[in-house]
Amino acid sequence: MKGDRLVIRELNKNLGLLLVTINQYFLHARILKNWGFEELGEHFFKQSIVEMKAADDLIERILFLEGLPNLQELGKLLIGESTEEIIACDLTKEQEKHEALLAAIATAEAQQDYVSRDLLEKQKDTNEKHIDWLETQQELIGKIGLPNYLQTAAQED
């Protein structure tokens, strides 16, 4: 099925952001694990898998619309050098993705591509949940202090 070029462009823009966040979350997961924060690292690793599945969904949709998934135009990774920076970098990237998702949803709606819109809406919902989680981590650090936060992050079940 031949898709609308504007929708395909927006899908590719969101795909590029997902490809960046896959790598960013994966690296942050390994950094945190290396620092001894197993549980926190595991959360970021699982998030990289969520991002990978979302990217796969976009690739399938772009191909269905007879477009070409653009895997070459990757943005810049934001890599933190402390736990606070990691959370801040990931929040920045998630907020960037949120803006791109809103724009893509509006384009899909305007072009009457309701299947793409629904796919993007689902990804937006997941994105908002992760933004909330990251903001909660920042609030926890602010309320209990970084040393206490890191102590809880280092504890194993």
Swiss-Prot record:
What biological-process terms (Gene Ontology) are attached?
intracellular iron ion homeostasis; iron ion transport
Per the record, the coiled-coil ranges are: none
Q: Where does heme b bind?
A: M52
Q: What happens when the gene is disrupted?
A: Grows less well under iron-limiting conditions, increased sensitivity to H(2)O(2) and paraquat.
Q: Show the InterPro entries listed in the entry.
A: Bacterioferritin, Ferritin-like, Ferritin-like_diiron, Ferritin-like_SF, Ferritin_DPS_dom
Could you tell me which Gene3D superfamilies the record lists for this protein? 1.20.1260.10
**Single GO molecular-function term?**
ferroxidase activity
Task: Relate the protein's function as given in its record.
Answer: Iron-storage protein. Plays a role in protection against iron-mediated oxidative stress.
Please state what the protein is called.
Bacterioferritin BfrB
- Species assigned in the record: Neisseria gonorrhoeae
What's the name of its gene? bfrB
